[in-house]
């Protein structure tokens, strides 16, 4: 498997849509890896509209010649004919292979690395975003070093919109998604990532506004029942508020909780007299609450969650016992059949992943999700 680095650009029509269609078409060649931000630059060397440009990687088993031909075919499918116009000109879609692994190649039809890359800031800046330490095989200079030395002073700005990774396409079939897992597993972070890439709005649990939460961590037995009741009521209200607020610009929702998490926590915090009453209240309220069609369950170890809790630094969480997290993990495992009867559930072990800081781990997580969506 080889890693190919590709630059993509357009300055005609709906520029971002041309970029997106080009990116989506490349998936026939292999798996898309990381994608840079989109940058905007004025046209250079001719009179034309500003360009949008980006860079991305693809893992492929195809040869360089086949990759190049397929890129040309994709350009042609979007109305670009390279042979008709020489020099700088307007382009519906431009796809250039920058690197194919560390291959150095010089043939009449293909030169690798791309011979003009070091002179083009619109290539180097997005490339540096996704591969700053990648070395040019000729002189061993990193992309960061090439960018720092680049004399191209063409104005460049970050475009307000991003390209959607094709890996999110299957998730877009679900207009209401929830993310679940124990405290500190990364639910809210993944919720925000999914919402941003799908163009959905978020429902984020309002734990910071709950006056009982700090008190509960100090005196669990005393404040367990009012805490669970307040969370249940707030989750119910948030779901209903979301269903009442029609947003013409955002077609779906990602929530960092499912309402039934109240049952998981209540089982671990309430006594034998309180829990049956709480169950009755939940059953009554949940009947009128909208349900997601997909739940993404993040399976995390208690030890890793404890580490994450320490990192995010919420003072009232710092003394959460690790055995309490272990009980929650066991409670969620027992709760999964309850969710599976009501929606599609994708359960992913993330104990070896850091999708918050590592883009490759995020892509790995999304691939795991897609595998299970395909199997359903």
Description of each model-found segment:
Residues 17, 21-64:
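Short, surface-exposed acidic-centric catalytic microdomains
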Residues 159-174, 307-376:
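NTP-dependent small-molecule kinase module
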Residues 187:
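Conserved lysine of the Walker
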């Amino acid at each position: 498997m080889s890693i190919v680095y590709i630059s993509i650009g357009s300055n005609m029509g709906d520029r971002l849509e041309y970029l997106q269609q080009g990116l989506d078409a490349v998936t026939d060649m292999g798996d898309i890896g990381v994608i840079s931000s989109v940058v905007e630059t004025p046209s250079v060397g001719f009179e034309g509209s500003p360009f949008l440009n980006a860079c991305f990687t693809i893992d492929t088993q195809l040869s360089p010649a086949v990759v190049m031909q397929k890129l040309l075919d994709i350009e042609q499918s979007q109305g670009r004919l390279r042979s008709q116009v020489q020099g700088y000109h307007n382009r519906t879609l431009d796809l250039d292979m920058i690197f194919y692994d560390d291959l150095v190649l010089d043939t009449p039809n293909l030169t690798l690395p791309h011979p003009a890359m070091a002179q083009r800031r619109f290539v180097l800046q997005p490339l540096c975003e996704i591969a700053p330490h990648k070395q040019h095989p000729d002189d061993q200079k990193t992309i960061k070093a090439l960018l720092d030395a680049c004399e191209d002073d063409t104005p460049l700005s970050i475009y307000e919109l991003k390209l959607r990774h094709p890996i999110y396409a299957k998730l877009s079939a679900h207009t209401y998604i929830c993310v679940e897992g124990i405290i500190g597993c990364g639910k809210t972070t993944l919720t925000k990532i999914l919402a941003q890439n799908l163009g959905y709005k978020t429902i984020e649990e309002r734990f910071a506004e709950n006056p009982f939460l700090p008190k509960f961590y100090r005196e669990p037995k005393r404040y367990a029942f009012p805490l669970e009741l307040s969370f249940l009521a707030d989750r119910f209200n948030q779901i209903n508020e979301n269903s009442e607020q029609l947003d013409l610009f955002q077609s779906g929702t990602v929530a960092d909780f499912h309402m039934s998490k109240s049952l998981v926590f209540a089982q671990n915090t309430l006594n034998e007299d309180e829990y049956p009453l709480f169950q009755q209240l939940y059953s009554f309220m949940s009947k009128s609450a909208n349900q997601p069609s997909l739940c993404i369950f993040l399976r995390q170890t208690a030890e890793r969650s404890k580490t994450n809790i320490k990192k995010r630094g919420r003072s009232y969480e710092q003394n959460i016992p690790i055995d309490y997290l272990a009980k929650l993990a066991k409670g969620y495992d027992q709760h999964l059949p309850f969710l599976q009867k009501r929606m599609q559930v994708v359960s992913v072990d993330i104990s070896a992943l850091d999708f918050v800081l590592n883009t490759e781990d995020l892509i790995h997580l999304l691939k795991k999700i897609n595998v299970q969506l395909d199997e359903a």
